[in-house]
Amino acid sequence: MRLTVGQVHRHVLALASSRSCFVLGDNLPLRMLSLPRAVRFHQTAWLGTETVQDKSASLTLASLEGQNKVEYGKKEKATRIGGPKPSSRASALKVKPKVSSFNSKPAKSTLPKSAVVKKTLKIDESLFSAKSFEELGLPPLLIDRLNKEGLSTPTEVQSAAIPIISQKHDAVIQSYTGSGKTLAYLLPILSEIGPLKRPTEQDGSDKRSGVEAVIVAPSRELGMQIVREVEKILGPNDKRLVQQLVGGANRSRQEEALKKNKPLIVVGTPGRISEISAGGKLHTHGCRFLVLDEVDQLLSFNYREDMHRILEHVGRKSGTSSRDILGPLARRSERQTILVSATIPFSVIRAARSWGHDPVLVRAMSVVPLDSITVPRPVLSQTDANPNSPSNSVNQAAVNSLPPSLEHYYCISKAQHKVDTLRRCIHALEAQTVIAFMNNTKPLKDVVFKLEARGMKATELHGDLGKLARSTVLKKFKDGEFRVLVTNELSARGLDVPECDLVINLDLPTDSTHYAHRAGRTGRLGRKGTVVTICEETETFVVRKMRKQLAVPIKPCEFTEGKLLVHNEEDVE
C-alpha cells in the first residue's frame, strides 16, 4: 500500500478501543483485530482505498509492479471510505495498494514530486525509412566500423529504435526474430560509451572507469551471441571493453577479467550478474544503460531474486533529478532502461511502466507511448489485428514476432513415423541447415540415432550438455558439419544461424508464443524460410488454434515421392 501522511498535530489519539475494531477496505477481508489497550499515534489518520491491479492477471514480476512507498507531504484532500468527516485536526492518509515487484518491504527512499522530470517525445517519421546509418545520427567512427563489417543499411526496427534511444528515452523494442533488435540497442549505446562514441566537451574531464552498460539475457547462448556482436563492432583492439558474465563459466576468471580489463559493457545471465554483484566484484551504481533482452522470459518466477538485485543496484531509475534526492542514491548515475523481445505480452508493458520513466513501445515503422496501451483483447482473425492501433499493440505481440518471409505448413503423421516424416520433409524441401524442435530432452538422442542410421548427419543440443560441449556443437552446426540440429526449447530464443532454411516442430509448441520463437530461427534478416509442424491427427485442432492466434496461413501438406504436396484445408477436414 502507498501511504501519504500529513504533518499535523502530534500526540492525537487515533484508535481507542477496549477490545477490538473492524477494518474495512477493497483489498482487506473483514476481520477482528485484538487491541488490548489504546494505541497512541503521532498523527491522526483515516483510510481510503483504490484498486490499481488486475486481480486476474498472472503472477509475474511485472504483474507485481512497484514497491510500497511512504511519501511525506502537505495536507491534501482524500476520498473517505465511510464514517464521519474527519476533524480539522486530522490529516488525510491515502492508501493506494501497489504491490511490490519482488517483495513487500518498504522502499528505502522516496522521491518528491519536484524530482520528477518529464521527457518530451519527438518522433521523426522520416527516419523510419532511413537508407543509411548516417541518417540516424551515429558518430563517424562507429559508422566506419559498421562499413568494415558490411553493415550499411539499417533494418526497419533499427531505424525506429536508434533515434529514440539516442534521445535518452526508456524503450520497449518489439520486432520479429532476426530483424536486428540486438544492433537496434547496441548502436546507440556504443554512440555514448567506449572508443567509438561521439566526441563531447567532457571527454577530457570524464574520469568514469566503471561499468556503464549492463545487458541481461536469460540464456548463456544468447548472452555469448550478444558479446560476439559487441566484439565485432569494437574490433580486435577494444574487444576487452566487453565482458561476459554467464553461468556455467569459471566465476574466478570472470572476476579477474573485471578487475584487469575494467570493461565498460557487461553481458550476462541474471544469476551470475547478481552473484558477482553481491560479492562486491561488480560495481554498477554508475551504470547508464540497463538492457533486458528477451524480457518476457526474464519475468519468470525463477529469476525473481536475481532480477530484484539487478534492478536495485544498476544505476538510478530515470526521470529523477539528483538535486532533489538525498543519500547514496544521489551519487548514482541515471540509467536508461531498455526492454527487448520478439513477443511483448501485457505483463512486459506493466514492467516497463514500473521500471522505467515515460517508456515508449518501439516497433518497425512505429513508436507509441506506453501510456496509450490498454488491456488487450484476443485476436481471432487477421481482420481483428490492426498494427497501427495503440490499444492493439500488445495483441500483436505474437503476430509481429514472425518474420514476413516464412512459409508455414503442417503434416499429419503417426507418432512412431515422425522421424521418417522428418527425413522425407528435409529431402523434399532440399534443406541444408535444419533445426528440429522437441519438448523434452530424453527423445533427442533417439531421433539423432535414427537420422544418422539413414545417412543424415545430425546432432543434439540441450541444457544438460556442458558449456564447452554446447559451444562445440553450435560451431560445427554453423560450419555445416551437421545438417540437422535436434534440440529443445533451449534454442528457441537467441540462437542465430542465418543459414537455417528449415525449422521443424517434431512436438507441438506449447502455445503461439513458443511457435513464433521457434519459427524465428529461420528467415532471418529477410531471408526465405520454411516452418513445418509434424503432428498427429488428434492434434490438428491445436495447429488451427495457433493459426488463428498468429493470423498466418499454416497449410496442410504431405511429402510424397520426394516432393511437397500442399492440400486445401477443406480437403483435409
Curated annotation (Swiss-Prot):
For the motif Q motif, give the residue ranges: 131-159
User: What are the binding positions for ATP in this chain?
Assistant: S175, Y176, T177, G178, S179, G180, K181, T182
**Matches recorded under InterPro entries:** DEAD/DEAH_box_helicase_dom (IPR011545), DEAD_box_RNA_helicases (IPR050547), Helicase_ATP-bd (IPR014001), Helicase_C-like (IPR001650), P-loop_NTPase (IPR027417), RNA_helicase_DEAD_Q_motif (IPR014014)
Keyword vocabulary terms for this entry = ATP-binding, Helicase, Hydrolase, Nucleotide-binding, RNA-binding
**Where does the Helicase C-terminal domain lie?**
421-565
The family database entries (Pfam families) matched by this protein are listed as: DEAD, Helicase_C
Q: Which reaction does it catalyse?
A: ATP + H2O = ADP + phosphate + H(+)
Q: What is its EC number?
A: 3.6.4.13
- Sequence ranges assigned to domain Helicase ATP-binding in this UniProt record: 162-362
Task: Identify a single GO molecular function assigned to this protein.
Answer: ATP binding
Record flagged with keyword ATP-binding: yes
- Which residue numbers does the motif DEAD box cover? 293-296
Give the UniProt family note. Answer: Belongs to the DEAD box helicase family.
The free-text domain note is: The Q motif is unique to and characteristic of the DEAD box family of RNA helicases and controls ATP binding and hydrolysis.
Tell me the protein's name: DEAD-box ATP-dependent RNA helicase 47B
Q: What is the lineage of its organism?
A: Eukaryota, Viridiplantae, Streptophyta, Embryophyta, Tracheophyta
